């Protein structure tokens, strides 16, 4: 049975006709294992992958060989020859993408993160540069459809049946707060309730006090490595609200339920005030938002800070803790769960990511839609094909231990920190197809993964992130213009310049209240439009 439509579908979307970075393979040059059959030159498919530093793609040390093996296997199985050309990009990905699209260059697939912060879905949807995959996935890649059907696919489909990109299917529960445990205990604090001789850090007040004591031990001017968006993912937001500056939620405004930017709501004033106080006191850096990922990692590894939340996904925190341990064998680490505002508070929670944290879009001008869908149908036809495209050649680049875990071949343990292959040709991760756990995790690391990051009770309830909304040109202009003053006010707080709770020039409202009220009044019509879509899609999902 075909997927449930969100609205009556008026006309079928026609697939583009077949037609005519950095190269990751030699076109049609390899001999396959199938009797030495030589694969002919294939149809070229160009992939752009990247995003902000935490989402950047890194080419593996054996990347070209893995991609060639995948191209060969696909040719053996189907008789179709493809040559992938991949540009592994970082924060400049969107600039390069815009330039290439404007120049008419071939770009077929774009892979990046979704939702806000110049997410892939917002950019391509807003600029009408994506190919609507609503029918193509179901009709031409049924194996892919089976792997993404339900909430993941719904979250990348608008109320008008526009599927912007292929969604990842990954656990939405993956955050934590990495702390130098030895510094924590030396400062007189603990995360262990049984250590009654030390102060238990389960709230923001004691966390702040711990950080200031850490500064005395390290001699550094701040204790936490992390930008404002990282703080709101795991530290400051959940103690006060369900959505912050970088997210939206359902709130009550003048008696009406509205989907609103969390950064303009009454509750957010306490979040922003906390971040301002931390910048002033030295809990966080006043330049936190400009710290690059590599620089932030280096600072923590060198012992200059005691808390690390820059890209606070648990796998990244474990990677950083291991690198820090290698440099300082005496250092110990722990991962904290979400913190309350005070000892007597109850509210807490990390932000939950959508299952579709990442997406792969096909550009509107691509002439390779058929070829891409056929390839993905093959990738998602079996766990073996998916694992080849995700991990590399089994027995060469990774080992399946048969117990739900994987490891690396003897002598290739370095692949744990310097991967052989990026996993690029699944386009996005899909844990429904394969969800192997690295066998090299310690018991403590597994505790962090399963009991801290993986505990659904540690997360804010906010389903707005699971919906994809459309905007009109008029509303985009209104929202863009209205955001300027609100953003300036937020930056002044993040950098410790202006207290958001100080009295504004009107003598009646705080600085925050004045900016937030003005923003809300200007975007009210926009919020109502988004809220209508939210209610429609929620009703259709049942």
What are these regions (language model features)?
Residues 1-16:
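Sec-dependent bacterial lipoprotein signal peptides
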Residues 10, 18-542:
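Extracytoplasmic/secretory soluble proteins
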